[in-house]
Amino acid sequence: MNTVFNGKDFANKYYLILKEFLKQHDLRDKIALKVVLANNEPASKLYVSIKNRVAKEIGLNVEVIKFSANSVQSDILEVIDRENKNLSTDGIIVQLPLLRHMDSNSILNSIVYSKDVDGLSFVNLGKMILGDKKGFIPCTALAVLKILLDEGIRTSGKTVVVVGRSPLVGKPISILLSSKPYDATVIVCHSKSIYLDVYLRQADIVISAVGKPKLIDKSMLCGEPYVIDIGISEIETDNGKILSGDTDFDNIKDCVKFITPVKGGIGPVTVLMLMFNTIKAHLINNNMFDILDRLEKLVEV
């Protein structure tokens, strides 16, 4: 029977585990996450509100720091510098995209790596490549690993086609899955790959994150692969705008073993991994490594 993944139920199960973990170790309301919001896009505001709600539900303190369209880059850098030095701040994230006149690399890399719980700084990306467990893996990549593990989808010796090469998603996933202990043979494709269908037909697992609606249909797949669809786009229909993934979901759902939908798929698990990383940051920065071991056993990745 083909499986359509339910990310909401998956994440809710672990939210209860994290909530109880914080209660048991007297950590409720003692871990602080700062969220920088510097754009006016409705989607970004929605994502921030979800992160804020979930964090508060499990027992984290959250502050959303908003910047107007008139803000300049130095305004954000000043706030990040302040929070880097603030001993009560455990994690700092910047909701992307930023305002057009701002350089995201400069801003992301201004966050001290020990508080970069989105795992997007050069330091944390380097730690990920080297397998340093004190670093932070980007949350979406971590969500993919968590889904594969919990759903019993073996990667060792399997062919994984990753469609997308962004530093936020595609590159981290391809690096991680080709490393120990995942040991997959990874083929990286992207929106300009000429023979995408040829590579996809070799795949045991397909992970797509390019943001091109309905790029992948059943004619491009072979042998009922597992599919994790991270891409999200808006498309026009006769009934107005709807969300679409990189896959033509209705077209392929019956010819794959497993698939994540656009709504309630990878998104809730990505938020879960942000909560995990934030708690991890607090434990590392306070030398609470015995408690960190317990956390990592509860939320195995």
From Swiss-Prot:
GO terms for biological process: L-histidine biosynthetic process; methionine biosynthetic process; purine nucleotide biosynthetic process; tetrahydrofolate interconversion. HAMAP family: THF_DHG_CYH. Homodimer. Belongs to the tetrahydrofolate dehydrogenase/cyclohydrolase family. It catalyses: (6R)-5,10-methylene-5,6,7,8-tetrahydrofolate + NADP(+) = (6R)-5,10-methenyltetrahydrofolate + NADPH; (6R)-5,10-methenyltetrahydrofolate + H2O = (6R)-10-formyltetrahydrofolate + H(+). Its EC number is 1.5.1.5, 3.5.4.9. This is Bifunctional protein FolD. NADP(+) binds at residues 164-166, 191, 232. Signal peptide: none annotated. Pathway: One-carbon metabolism; tetrahydrofolate interconversion. Catalyzes the oxidation of 5,10-methylenetetrahydrofolate to 5,10-methenyltetrahydrofolate and then the hydrolysis of 5,10-methenyltetrahydrofolate to 10-formyltetrahydrofolate. Keywords: Amino-acid biosynthesis, Histidine biosynthesis, Hydrolase, Methionine biosynthesis, Multifunctional enzyme, NADP, One-carbon metabolism, Oxidoreductase, Purine biosynthesis.
